[in-house]
Amino acid sequence: MIVAEARRCNYIIKSNAQILRQANSKTIGIMLPSVSNPFFAELAAVIVDEVKRRGYNAIVSVTNESEVDQESCLSSLMARDVEGVIAAPCGSNQNLFYSVNRDMAPVVLVDRFFIDSNISYISSNNMGGALDATRYLINKGHKRIVCIQGDQNLITNRKRVEGYRKAMTEAGLEDNISVVGDSFSVQNGYFETKMIVGNRSSLPDAIFALSYTTALGVMKALKESNLTAGKDISLISFDDNMSLDYMQPEITRVAQAVDEMGKFAVKVLFEQIDNPQTVSQIELNTKIIYGDSVAEL
């Protein structure tokens, strides 16, 4: 709807954008796929705080991983004269964001982004983080490592799987590559782990859960199966959350710089408000937080 209208009334949109900049609404739109997911909840809090620190108001919209809701949210934000948008997109319709960024208001993507796009984004080095995590498992003697992935359409998931595959291949373990699952959810982690541990005679050495929520499902399934992470099977997670510190055992995980990501997103957006030609594409380093869930084999 936005793209079609942009093409049909391009001159009107450009005129409105000029009026918007003059009007100075001092409002920023934030679009996230979920606020029940701890990662996005934390990211939203950082972005809102940083926007308010700059004397602006923030409108937070939730797309529920729906492209239809995403387009509706963008339309609503444009109708409310936001000066810029920070979004974690769902789906593959980059033209939607390109049109808004070009004709209506600056857009900065956060966490998720589009490859070969001239739209600014702030994300993590997802491939590097997964590469480091898998190498860590391999260096601890693990050879049969199962990767529980999320939605294959998400760039963050694809990059993490790419890092896992690269580490396995460079170690000569390409025949042991095993990628299962289809969402960054507790349910997915639980279901896939139940399938993995169903045959006790062929347990893998380790599970690499590609999100914090997936790791929660893994832990639940292991507990129900009377298996202990770090003893019967090793576990490492991508994503950090303070609750992992209080689990028994404490989960080894790849931490993203969520605070830095949110602050950078706001900084880049305001740079684009001042200079619409600015494009910044940044991938932040991750780090491994060591717990007790990885055994030495």
Predicted segments with their positions:
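N-terminal helix-turn-helix DNA-binding module of bacterial transcription factors
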Residues: 1-26
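Generic beta-sheet signal
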Residues: 88, 110, 148, 236-238, ...
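Hinge/beta->alpha junction and helix N-cap segments in small-molecule ligand-binding domains
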Residues: 32-42, 60-69, 94-95, 112, ...
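Alpha-helical recognition/docking segments in bacterial nutrient-uptake
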Residues: 19-135, 139, 197-202
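Flexible loop/turn connectors
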Residues: 195-297
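Short acidic capping loops at alpha-helix termini that bridge into adjacent secondary structure
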Residues: 144-145, 174-177, 228-235
